[in-house]
Amino acid sequence: MSATSINPNNWHWTSKDCRVWSHEYFNKELPKIQASEGPTSARITQVNSCEGDVDVSMRKRKVITIFDLKIQMEFKGETKDGVEATGSITCPELSYDLGYSDYVFDIDIYSASKEKEPIKELVREKIIPQIRQLFSGFSQVLLQTHGDDVYLSTEEHNGNAARGLPVHSSFKQNNSSQTSSNKGTTTVAAGSGSDGSRVSAVVNTADISENYTFDAPANELYATFLDPARVAAWSRAPPQLDVRPQGAFSLFHGNVVGKFLVLEENKKIVQTWRLSSWPTGHYAEITFTFDQADSYTTLRMIMKGVPIGEEEVVQGNIQDYYIRPIKTVFGFGAVL
């Protein structure tokens, strides 16, 4: 592959984390909102919390925003009789795929009383529409402010790649030496790995498991793990997928590799799986089981053969680089 083909025409995925900037933006803009109705007035005083993910990304020459936030702010008001009130407004979901009328707001008056109701009503009628307007324009503000940062020229991207600089999220590796332990482990001696490759040394291993809930049908979630376009979206890197038994896969620019072992449509995926930092030739075996319920799907993950000391690293990677982005990109549930 020639140097100029690493990122032809901004074809691959680059991304910028804008969480800190977003918090600062709302801290600045929300307190500008105020309203009055006769002698009754109210205004936003501060932002209490702004939690979630905000990314500006570029894929196939298209710059997009992906965000999912929970925002809580405080307000203060006063009635014509001099009654003062403070309270909070919570938007549980400010997401890239919601519009002006889709946002939900919970209004809470501290030490509520009948005398304070006019302030709450003013907030509902005059303050909330202004917040909706601000939120509905957030995506465009993100693009205008940060779009140029992810739209790299071919020369810029190639220069970064040549220097080994990251242009997207990559899996965390645990490169520290580990102390062997046989407690609750299986020992894999030198010989063949689960994919048929050579294991160069004895590896003490453990098993890990976790369940995840998605607001999506099993067939959609199953496809999200196998369809190249979907995998590229949530992994933020071009995948290599040979989706068939014994077909190889490579994710996150080779940080995760393995082979498909079992593919039961909409029900189960079994793979060999390894991080590039693991002992040469050693593969774990990961099973994803898709359990469909009435309105959601439970994804059951079991990984056998994780090198001792890597358990937390692997669990964190599955959460941060599989589960969280799938929910965020496709709207398959709340991000915790």
From Swiss-Prot:
Stretches for region Disordered: 162-195
Xref: InterPro entries: Aha1, AHSA1-like_N, ASHA1/2-like_C, START-like_dom_sf
Biased composition (Low complexity): 169-187
One BP annotation, GO: protein folding
One GO CC annotation: cytosol
GO molecular function: ATPase activator activity; protein-folding chaperone binding
Family: Belongs to the AHA1 family.
Cross-referenced PANTHER family: HEAT SHOCK PROTEIN 90 HSP90 CO-CHAPERONE AHA-1, LD43819P
Protein name from the UniProt record: Uncharacterized protein C1711.08
Origin species: Schizosaccharomyces pombe (strain 972 / ATCC 24843) (Fission yeast)
